[in-house]
Each structure stands twice: as C-alpha cells, then as structure tokens.
C-alpha cells in the first residue's frame, strides 16, 4: 500500500503545528515517513507529552516518607505498613466518552485498572467522577445512560467494587462530558514492577488481546477541541472486553511470580508506540520492533495502524530470555497472545520493521525527551464581584430545591448499577462520605474519595484548588482515616487561551499549597486539556482522588445516628453564600467569591476528628449545601429526623470550609466540647437528631416526604 505524501494538511490533521513539524525535520534530517509522522504525532500530542502543563506539574509536591513511587510510572505507590503498598491513579477518558459513551467510559475503566495491575497490584477499589451538561440538554440523557452503563459493565464484569465517586450537571459540560476513572490496588511493597527496560538483546514481548484498527489516533483526538466533525471521530474510540482484561490481569500477576519480567508497561494512549518508547527511554536503550510478529485481528493492517492502534487489553514486556517457556505457558493457560515482537538494542534508535521494510528509524531518546514544552501565556482570574443581597428562603423549601436537583439528589440510580460488594471486603458502599475497603486478611482498611467543586475553581482557581484537596482530606478524616496521598485529574479547556491557562496555573498553586499543608503528596495523575466545543470551555475541574489508611477496623467512624443524638458542628460558621449550591439552585445565580480555605484549620480539625473518634457516632464534612444538606443526608441515611436551631439561609446553607457535622450522645458531646476547648477549636451544638421530621427553626416537613424527593428525583429527571 502506497503511503500518503507528507503535506501541510496531513501534518495539521495529526495535530502538529508548522513549528513542531520543522522541529521533526531537524531531528530526523529528512522528510519523515507516514509512520514516523504518526509516531511523532502520538508522542508529542498534549495527551501524552503534557507539553502545555509540564512546567506547572513540576511544582506539585510529590514526595514523602510514605511515597514509594511518585509520578512518572503507570500509577503511584504508597506504603501502608506491614510490607504492603497501595497503588492508585486517576485518569480521564473525556473525549472518547462524549463521542461513544458506553465504550468511552468502559475503556476508561479498563485503562486505569491496567495501570494498577501493571505495577504488580491486584485492584481492590474503583471510583469515578462524572460531569455532564444540564439535564434538559438533548444529549445529556444519552450520555448519562451510556457512561454509567459503560462504567458498570466493565467494572462489574472485571470484578472490582466501585466504592465512591461524584456526578454533577452544569450547562458548561453540554459540549464535553468528563469521565474521570480511579482505581487502587494492593501489592507487596518490595514487589513493585516498573517500566524501565534493562539489558541489551532482551526480548520485547507482546501480551494480551490482538491488535485491531480501533482507537487509531485516539490520543491525538483527545488533544483537540470538538467541532461539527465530531461524529467522524467515532472510529478513534477504543472497544473494550472486560473478560479479556480479567484474564490479562490474572496472567500478568501470575507471570510476575515467575521472575520472568524485567519491565512491563500497559498499552494505553498511543498503544505500541508510547509503551515501547517509554520502556526504552527509561532504560536508556533502543528498541526494535518487527510488526509482522504482532498478533492482529484484522487483515492488511499497516505499520502506521499497528503503531497507533489503541486496542485494549494489551501489554508490552521485556522478558528474561531463559524463562520464555515458563512465561509463554502462563499466557497459553489464560488463552492470551504471547508473542516476541522485538528486542532491546544498544543503539539509541526506535526501529520499526514491517515485512522486511523499515517503516520508522528514529532517535528514541530524542523522540521521548524533546517533545515541545510550552510556557503558555496566562492571566490570573480576576477577583469575583462581591455577592449581592441574598433574600432568605424558607429553610425546607431551600432543602427541597437542593434534594430535587440532580446535583444533590441521591445517586442511588447510578450506584445501584455498579457492583459495590464484589471481593467481599467493602466496609462502606457509595452514598455518603468516603468509601472503605478492608485490606484482605488484615484488620486494616483503606478509604477512598474523589472531590472537586468546579464553580469554586471558576470563581477563584487558587481557593478552588485548595478546596478540592481540603474536601478530600475532610472526607477521609470523617471516616477515621489518616490521609496518605492524592492523585489529580486536571480537566480544563484550551490552554492556548491565557484565561484558561490562568485557571490551570491558579488551580495548581492551590493544590500545591493544600497537599503540602495536609501531607497528601500527589503521586500520580493526568491532564486533560482542550475540553471545549466550538470555543466554549468546561468549568475548570481539577478532580482530586485521595486515599487514607485506617490502621484498625475498630477505628472506622460509622454512620450510627440514633434518636436523641446531639448535632455538633466543628469549625466556625460565617454564612458564606458566594458560589453556594443554594445560590445556584434557588436563585439561579453564580456570584461572589469561593469560600476561603484555612489550611491550618483544616489540619487541626482533621487531627481532632481522628484523635476523638471514640466519642463520635457519625461524622460528615460540610460542603455543598452546607449544614442543612449535610444534616438531612445524615438523618435520612439513618431513618431518623433532625431538628436544627437555625432558620436563616446563611447559617443553614452557607458553605464555609473546614467544618464537620458530628452526631453523638449527650455525654460524648460534653467530652468533645471539653476536648475542643482545650485544643482552641470551635465546636457548637446546633440541634439534635430525633423524631420523624426535618425541622429547621420553625419550618418542618415529614422525613418520609423529603426522603421520597431525595431518592426519586435523579431517576425521574432521566426518565
């Protein structure tokens, strides 16, 4: 097959600028082949190279005594004691999920699971953070149904519990939904597998499913805005098979026990290209690939297609040659392909041969290490206009407005489509607060949460970035966990626009300050830019996934609210209504500044919760919807009413940060009051849990009536 001529239009269609193509000419010293152009396009796109964000990502705190492996590998690795480690990462699959919701979301789950077990860890938990357009938008229902089905379909069949996540709706996501997938696994701390190749002449082995044409150019597609040609991009979306992935995981983990693995890398974005280049680059070696040896499922595939295919459930390994037969036997047992497709070489070359013809011959280190790195112009987000007058709303009417909104109604409709109990180690299922999974065979547990409030980031990127981390810290603390580390998923619009780049820079500054103050280093992550359609960007959405350790299951703070329990608020209440949920849902206003985050107070309050958990029967952080929504959710979950003394909108629905709602009996409340006073912290009695009504001041409604609204509104909105 004759390859197309390299023209300006072809270069542009590969997402390369004229300046970038000139750089390629200088590197190669000649006109690149079509396959070489595709390889550069894959390695230099935003999705793989982080060329617009790398400068700022370097400023994130990524180290700590608990960190075994930080950013740069497939996933982060954190020590949890007793010779064990938790391996985790969050990653986006936004563009594919908008084009093909089911497969886009499903393969997002599959990709993040591979990142975890490639490191030698068995996945034990998954989460997802989903953002959609307004519920009335003609595409939203299709996207929600497809994405949720894809997440559940893949995760359920693979056999990993989904223990948490978020679902939000805003018109800013009408043209670009966000699908951020998180996975965590367990491994022996001294048996982590890395991707750096080692040794000259070592076999490079292809593992897993066969290669097809699905996903060709997927990484490049994910590095551009959408326009009216979106439907033409459907073939760039990968197709997943969770049962093959399950077999691949079992085979990979079994293979790792044989000692045959020198290095291993999953094939994700840019497929065979990116995995081979990364392995060679990290090991300071070259790589030769013979593509006629690659297992394929379609006829007459070209070198270009094989190098850029993003077919799922595939891995690349550098093998100890003396253990080839033992390794092959493992993959034969699991009915998966095992093919030696190349070797490591001493020369700094990335050599691609197909049917005896050299299709690409490039300097590997240069290909990996000289992707453009841009210092994009940016402007700081201007200070938000002051919040105008907010008239008081009847408290129960305000609550009803929140719990009937798809943003704050129960997400049972979503979570019941996920298997939350598979593996039988789930301690707390999704619905309220952080998810908890027992470390199998031990008395320890891990807690997981995913958090961000995009409207805060839009108004004030620095405070919004801080708040995303702080809320994750609070969610972990509220269940009794000690926060360990975080993973970030940075979802933004077009970085070539200074105002968008300013949002990114501000959020990074806020996140950096928060993870440093709260001792939650960033150990892995992902950047998704160009989330725009026809020039309209999403809300800036820097999602934070966080993991905490519960040393003993007895230390878990439960949800044991009972009639007669006292309601306490830890932290100061000032009635901050700027950018609040009540302002948006009742008044349709997005005004004022985001609430400020006092990181010293956040740390002190989290430490106080953990130190005094023996006195606490139930605990939740106060975030969206303030005290009113938190108290209702806690009461509704327990099936008992709640009476709060306050009746004014600011006290009930304000979103001051750093606060927790605590339920306990009277004696425990007294002990907590004394402890808080001694620590110099503010702890206030705000009411009690009792009866079967929700009463805020003089306004009340039956709990059962409000519970029906809360439980049924989400599904009804999608009907």
Swiss-Prot record:
E.C. code: 6.3.5.3
One cellular component (GO) term of this entry: cytoplasm
Alphabetical keyword list: ATP-binding, Cytoplasm, Ligase, Magnesium, Metal-binding, Nucleotide-binding, Purine biosynthesis
Catalysed reactions listed for this entry: N(2)-formyl-N(1)-(5-phospho-beta-D-ribosyl)glycinamide + L-glutamine + ATP + H2O = 2-formamido-N(1)-(5-O-phospho-beta-D-ribosyl)acetamidine + L-glutamate + ADP + phosphate + H(+)
GO biological process: 'de novo' IMP biosynthetic process
Keyword Ligase: yes
Pfam families reported for this sequence: AIRS (PF00586), AIRS_C (PF02769), FGAR-AT_linker (PF18072)
Annotated binding of substrate, by residue: 92-95, 114, 238, 310-312, 528
UniProt GO MF annotations: ATP binding; magnesium ion binding; phosphoribosylformylglycinamidine synthase activity
Localization in the cell: Cytoplasm
Annotated catalytic residues: 47, 93
Function: Part of the phosphoribosylformylglycinamidine synthase complex involved in the purines biosynthetic pathway. Catalyzes the ATP-dependent conversion of formylglycinamide ribonucleotide (FGAR) and glutamine to yield formylglycinamidine ribonucleotide (FGAM) and glutamate. The FGAM synthase complex is composed of three subunits. PurQ produces an ammonia molecule by converting glutamine to glutamate. PurL transfers the ammonia molecule to FGAR to form FGAM in an ATP-dependent manner.
UniProt name for this protein: Phosphoribosylformylglycinamidine synthase subunit PurL
Chain's gene name: purL
